Amino acid sequence: MEKIANLDDIKKGGSLYFTYKGKKAILIRTKKDDIVAYIAVCPHEGGNIEWDGQLNIVLCECHLSLFNASDGSVYRHSTAFELNRGLTGIDVTVDKENNIFVK
């Protein structure tokens, strides 16, 4: 397991980017205090994704598709294409000292 951060490093509704197995990834702390991580690439055409802590969604910059922060599933996709795949999740654990690790 690889340590990414500590809970104190990320406020509720915040995020941070990190590298996971050579790929850009994002760690998100939702307003409900869930900790999730995803490969930071849209499954449609590989566009960058951004976290919107106000709306609690992940947004693809290319086609404005939206993904649920809690599980990476498609929330809404562009009408120009059908998107059936959600974001690629990364297993996250938090230890008793609030350190955040990915597998």
Identify the residue ranges that each predicted region occupies.
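N-terminal pre-ligand scaffold of iron-sulfur
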Residues: 1-55, 68-69, 73, 86-103
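Short cysteine/histidine-rich metal-coordination sites, predominantly Zn2+-binding motifs
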Residues: 56-64, 74-83
